[in-house]
Amino acid sequence: MRVRVAVLKVVIVILLLVLCVEFVFYLFVVPATSFAKVEFSGNVTISPEYLMKAAGLTGKEKWMSLDGFTISERLASVPLLAQVEVLKKFPDTMHVHVVERVAIALGFVHVQGRAMPVQIDKTGTVFSVGTAPLDTVLPVVSGLEFRNPRVGLRVHDQLVPLFVQLDNLSKRNPLLLGEISEISIEQKRHGGYDLALYLVRAPIRVRMDKNLSEEKLRYVILLVDALREWQTQRRIKELDVRGGTAVYR
């Protein structure tokens, strides 16, 4: 009986030692010696290789040596990214979730005498110069001024609500947004701005205030459709809805 108890104690001690060794191995050895596994999510158009390079990673870093805050800061400085979240998972994984910027409108700037498109997101941030999305038709916003156009620039603070409204339209009623060909920003003499809309369906310039809501746009399109019937009898060039009543010229 005593022999069995002694053997059982030895077995228990051995098991405890094995567990301690495994605990130490996973707690200290694996994080300090294993190459970190970097996982990305949320990237649709950006490759993992691009993100690795932007984060300053080579794929040979040890998990223990990774600084999540530094990596997050590096990726947050990439103009193509709107949000970045870095999470280190014990013992050897780092997960990086990104949210890419999405173009809500196009602008045009002049670089060395050439007109080039710039992509602008809902925050009014320019994140691409010289390229336009091939699979999406976006409204053009004219009247923007950039002295030195480059990625990372933002439009003036007073214009940001316009891009927020465009983003809301794209989510709630993209077909309605697709009716807009161009939005021209017209600065007022004493501050603020009005808008001039050019619609796809008719060559009529629509002047309105900066409230580009879904209801207002529906109202404008309804008026334009009514005026189209008069186009054969009258040459209407402009519709003004800024004063609460519609005036055509």
Predicted regions and their residues:
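Glycine-centered tight turns that cap/initiate beta-strands
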Residues: L80-Q83
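Charged, solvent-exposed interaction patches on well-folded alpha/beta domains
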Residues: M1-F28, T33-F35, K53-K60, E73, ...
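Short extracytoplasmic
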Residues: E39-E73
